[in-house]
UniProtKB/Swiss-Prot annotation:
This is Phosphoglycolate phosphatase. The active site is at D13 (nucleophile). CDD domains: HAD_PGPase (cd16417). Its EC number is 3.1.3.18. PANTHER family: PHOSPHOGLYCOLATE PHOSPHATASE. It comes from Yersinia pestis. The gene is gph. It catalyses: 2-phosphoglycolate + H2O = glycolate + phosphate. Its cofactor is Mg(2+); chloride.
Length: 232
């Protein structure tokens, strides 16, 4: 694609893009709610709250549970969430299909790979290690590494500086409107994935430069051989 001809690096969102993390997040939120005598929300609902970081996830859960939340209640629930999520983050997460093989091909072609996630930073490295993909990333930016998270472009600016790339040279791949808005604000070309967590909205409504249904389709989209072609 012409839009991607200048690409010299690729960066990814984490939850809903590389990793199906909804089961672990839902278990942690439900246990935090139960600890306070509140009902469980369940994975289907929690998956629509993912993408803006842990504080917003907690706020959405409390709002759903009918609790008028203040800073103290949010902080208390966030502490409970962190406690439980530390126990569920690894076993409650799995890679989406063909993620590892696709990352391997990007790395084999000499492209630096970055990660930008709103997930609290302490959870990121252990999760990547448990999934066997940590070594593919040149730079990892978690939710605590910047003052403002996606959809603000600040995390992308930080990554561009660390990789020494111009905005037009870095492709950003994500599954939610926050990812697309951040990329567009930073001036980076972007791809939206249809299978992730986007608040029940079609990713195409955010107008990414390209929409893909399968992670491995990224390779031919940027001019590299597909995984299927490499098997021949």
């Amino acid at each position: 694609m012409v839009k991607f001809k200048a690409i010299r690096g690729v960066a990814f969102d984490l939850d809903g893009t590389l990793v199906d993390s909804a089961p672990g997040l839902a278990r942690a939120i439900d246990m935090a709610l139960a600890h306070q005598g509140l009902p469980a929300a369940g994975e289907a609902l929690v998956s629509t709250w993912i993408g803006n970081g842990a504080d917003v996830l907690v706020e959405r859960a409390l709002h759903w549970a009918g609790r008028e939340h203040n800073a103290q209640l949010v902080a208390q629930t966030r502490e409970l969430f962190d406690h439980y999520y530390a126990k569920t983050v690894e076993q409650g997460s799995q890679l989406f299909p063909q993620v590892k093989a696709t990352l391997a091909q990007l790395a084999a072609n000499g492209l630096p790979i970055g990660l930008i996630t709103n997930k609290p930073t302490p959870f990121v490295a252990p999760l990547l290690t448990s999934l066997g993909i940590s070594d593919y990333f040149s730079v990892i930016i978690g939710g605590d590494d910047v003052v403002v998270k996606k959809p603000h472009p600040a995390p992308l600016y930080l990554l561009l500086g660390k990789l020494g790339l111009h905005a037009r040279e870095m492709l950003f791949v994500g599954d939610s409107r926050n990812d697309i808005m951040a990329a567009q604000a930073a001036g980076c070309p972007c791809i939206g994935l249809t299978y992730g967590y986007n608040y029940g909205e079609a990713i195409a409504t955010s107008h990414p430069d390209c929409v893909l249904a399968h992670f491995a389709d990224l390779l031919p989209a940027i001019g590299l051989p597909s995984l299927k072609d490499q098997e021949v």
